[in-house]
């Protein structure tokens, strides 16, 4: 049973279809962390804050940080709770309130993981995000049925290792879609 037909997209990427008119999500890759009858929660993983540095973020949070943390990118996770700070990360998963998404991916947003990341003592693989994306009951299911999104299982390589500018293109290529050969129109067969 596919995620589309079962309604369970936790642990999947959502890729905006080529030509999606919503500027909040055009050419985005979103990691879905929760999807159930009450709605869905996800994080855009291919948009970087143009001005905010890691050091500035942690100083704003009054968290002491290692100077090298300034080199990490701060991702724009979505238009909901834009000042909320979240961490998508690999093991360990023993942070307060960690939501384990699959065997190798968790979501946390408590001070313990933020302090560990700031000191470079946290998980080996992580991305720091501001804000999230949210959908109400059946909203995401309806958008998928209306062909606004494509889905594939989350990939460690794309999430943690691929250049942010290439993530949308790489996920589309995994589906066999080459960005030069697509239509900006969607529909149903």
UniProtKB/Swiss-Prot annotation:
<dbReference type="InterPro" id="IPR003774">
    <property type="entry name" value="AlgH-like"/>
</dbReference>
<protein>
    <recommendedName>
        <fullName>UPF0301 protein HRM2_24640</fullName>
    </recommendedName>
</protein>
<dbReference type="GO" id="GO:0005829">
    <property type="term" value="C:cytosol"/>
</dbReference>
<comment type="similarity">
    <text>Belongs to the UPF0301 (AlgH) family.</text>
</comment>
<dbReference type="Pfam" id="PF02622">
    <property type="entry name" value="DUF179"/>
</dbReference>
């Amino acid at each position: 049973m596919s995620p589309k037909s079962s309604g369970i997209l936790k642990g999947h990427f959502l890729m905006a279809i080529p030509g999606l008119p919503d500027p909040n999500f055009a050419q985005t890759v979103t990691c879905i962390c929760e999807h159930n009858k009450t709605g869905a929660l996800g994080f855009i993983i291919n948009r970087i804050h143009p001005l905010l540095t890691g050091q500035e973020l942690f100083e704003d949070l009054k968290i002491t940080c290692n100077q090298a943390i300034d080199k990490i990118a701060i991702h724009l996770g979505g238009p909901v709770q834009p000042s909320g700070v979240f961490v998508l990360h690999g093991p360990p998963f023993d942070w307060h309130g960690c939501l384990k998404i699959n065997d190798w991916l968790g979501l946390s947003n408590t001070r313990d993981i933020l302090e560990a990341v700031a000191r470079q003592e946290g998980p080996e693989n992580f991305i720091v995000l501001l804000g999230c994306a949210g959908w109400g009951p059946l909203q995401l299911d309806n958008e998928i049925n209306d062909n606004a999104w494509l889905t594939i299982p989350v990939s460690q390589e794309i999430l943690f290792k691929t250049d942010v500018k290439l993530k949308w293109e790489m996920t589309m290529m995994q589906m066999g879609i080459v960005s030069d050969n697509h239509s900006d129109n969607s529909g149903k067969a």
